[in-house]
Amino acid sequence: MTKQNETYPREEKLKAKRLIDELFITGKSVSKYPLRLVYIEVDEEGVPQFQTGVSVSKRYFKKAVDRNYYKRLLRETYRKNKHLLVDQMDKKFAMMLFYQTKDRLNYQEVEHKMKGLFEKFIKQQQATPTESDNQAI
C-alpha cells in the first residue's frame, strides 16, 4: 500500500488577490451542507493542480478563536482527503472552502461532509464538457 501525499504546502495555499477576486466574480460553486466550494479553472503554467483557501464567516462565529478552529478543521480535512481530487482530476483549479453554519460539527462529521463535497465536485466536472471538447466537435 502506497502512502498518499497528505501535505498542504505553501504553493497550494490560495493567496493571490487577483485569483481570489476572480473566484468571487466568475467562480462556480458546489455545496454539501454545511460546506460550500467555490472554484475556477486555472490555465497558468507553474501553478499547482489545486490552490485552496478556507473561510469561516464572522456571521456564524463571533469569536476569532472559534473561526480559527473551524478554518484549521477545514484545512486538515482538505489535506487528508485531497487525494480524492488529485486522483480523479487532471485540470488545475483555484478553490475556496466555506463553512456555512452555526452548528458546531466535530472532525468526523466535517470530514464526511468534505468527502461528499469532493465527490459532488468530481461528478460535476465529469458531467460538464470543457471548452476544448466543444471546439473538437
Regions found by a protein language model. Give the residues of each.
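Positively charged, solvent-exposed patches that mediate nucleic-acid binding
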Residues: 1-137
